[in-house]
């Protein structure tokens, strides 16, 4: 189950653990609740889709 909350975060609930994704133009991050670990991943590690 996932939804975007009022702050623009993408909330994904998996087996009772909520993942909050934070996406910007250069990186994507997510933290789990609980526990709230913040993980930031640069977007350039993902291959860009062909245009």
Curated annotation (Swiss-Prot):
<keyword id="KW-0325">Glycoprotein</keyword>
<keyword id="KW-0946">Virion</keyword>
<keyword id="KW-0426">Late protein</keyword>
<dbReference type="GO" id="GO:0044423">
    <property type="term" value="C:virion component"/>
</dbReference>
<feature type="glycosylation site" description="N-linked (GlcNAc...) asparagine; by host">
    <location>
        <position position="11"/>
    </location>
</feature>
<comment type="similarity">
    <text>Belongs to the asfivirus I177L family.</text>
</comment>
<protein>
    <recommendedName>
        <fullName>Protein I177L</fullName>
    </recommendedName>
</protein>
